[in-house]
């Protein structure tokens, strides 16, 4: 499959799941979506979500999953990560939450805040009745940065109930707008 933008063709492939690694931090030992990922590239991910009604849902959104075994710094306020990842639903950009960890000195003795999506309230998103477009821009520079030692080129996106307790019933995820 391919995607054409401004007269140039780009290769595509399907990925199934709520969390996708484009490149795993352990490199070739744990394969990601890209067979031979290279630094200084940008990937794009999209899907359509069919909603049987207009509704407010929660979403788990994440572009870097943190662990305290590393001395990684939390993202800067107003940014999802240090890679400049971005996400839009129905052409409206979804901004990151206010990060509770704001330290700028590396230490693995500082507890994680709400950096990981499952440790915070889901991000509210409005779905229209019918098809809703989800689009993500996923740039990556180097796979090791001063802020984050093990850069995780990945994304998580899934709709959940506003309280985050379960999946939203009746939704269909389809990059081809197919009700299956």
Annotated model-derived regions:
Residues 45-58, 123-129:
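Extracellular and analogous surface-interaction loops
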Residues 1-13, 166-180:
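Activation corresponds to long, low-complexity, non-globular regions
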Residues 65, 100-103, 174-179:
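Short, solvent-exposed aromatic-acidic interface loops
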Residues 53-77:
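A short beta-strand element within beta-rich, extracytoplasmic domains
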Residues 93-94, 165-167:
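Short, solvent-exposed loop/turn motifs
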Residues 47-53, 63-67, 140-142, 161:
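Beta-strand elements of well-folded, non-transmembrane domains
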Residues 1-53:
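Extended carbohydrate-recognition surfaces in non-catalytic/accessory domains of CAZymes
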Residues 73, 78-155:
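Beta-strand-rich ligand-recognition modules
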């Amino acid at each position: 499959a391919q995607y054409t933008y401004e007269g140039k063709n780009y290769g595509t492939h399907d990925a199934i799941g709520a969390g996708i690694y484009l490149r795993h931090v352990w490199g070739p030992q744990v394969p990601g979506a890209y067979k031979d990922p290279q630094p200084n590239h940008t990937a794009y991910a999209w899907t359509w979500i069919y909603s049987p009604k207009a509704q407010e849902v929660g979403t788990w959104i994440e572009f870097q999953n943190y662990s305290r075994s590393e001395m990684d710094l939390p993202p800067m306020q107003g940014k999802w990560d240090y890679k400049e990842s971005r996400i839009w639903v129905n052409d409206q950009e979804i901004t990151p939450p206010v990060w509770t960890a704001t330290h700028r000195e590396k230490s693995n003795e500082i507890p994680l805040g709400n950096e990981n999506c499952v440790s915070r309230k889901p991000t509210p998103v409005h779905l229209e009745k019918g098809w809703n477009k989800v689009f993500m821009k996923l740039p990556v520079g180097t796979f090791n940065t001063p802020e984050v030692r093990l850069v995780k080129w990945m994304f998580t996106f899934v709709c959940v109930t506003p309280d985050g307790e379960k999946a939203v019933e009746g939704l269909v995820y389809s990059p081809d707008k197919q009700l299956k």
